[in-house]
Design a protein with these regions (language model features):
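NAD(P)+-binding Rossmann beta1-loop-alpha1 motif at the extreme N-terminus of oxidoreductases
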Residues: 1-54, 58, 62
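Rossmann-like NAD(P)(H) cofactor-binding subdomain of soluble oxidoreductases
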Residues: 37, 56-61, 65-122
């Protein structure tokens, strides 16, 4: 199972770290994409087997699960550029983004989608 996480900020980074430290998905099966090379370098130093990229389109190409962890106001533009395939599962952690909006932003009404509301400890 391959997981791609779009966005490596507080939430995306926490999800990537949690998955990599767990037993279900190894770091080698996780790809993280973010425009900040500094953040990506930090993740890669922690988990050398994790693939880190700045190109979202390339990042999702081999994924089974695509976790989008960007700010709600960025969701439309981020999802519009992703070449999602029918077999891929889309997971949104953006607060306030509805299923109807996800369908609109992806133009894929048959896409399997989940909305999560995770919480990280402060």
């Amino acid at each position: 199972m391959k997981v791609t996480i779009i966005g490596a900020g507080n939430m995306g980074g926490a999800i990537a770290r949690g998955l990599a430290k767990g037993t279900i998905v190894g770091a080698a099966d996780i790809t993280v994409s973010d425009p900040s090379e500094k953040i990506l370098q930090q993740l890669h130093q922690e988990f050398p087997d994790m693939l880190v990229l700045t190109d979202n389109r390339v990042a999702v190409s081999e994924a089974d699960f695509v976790v989008v962890a960007v700010k709600p106001w960025l969701m439309k533009s981020v999802l519009a550029e992703l070449p999602l395939q029918p077999h891929q599962v889309l997971v949104s952690v953006a607060a306030g983004i509805t299923f109807d909006q996800l369908v609109e932003y992806t133009a894929a009404p048959e896409q399997t989608m989940f909305r999560l509301v995770p919480n990280t400890a402060m």
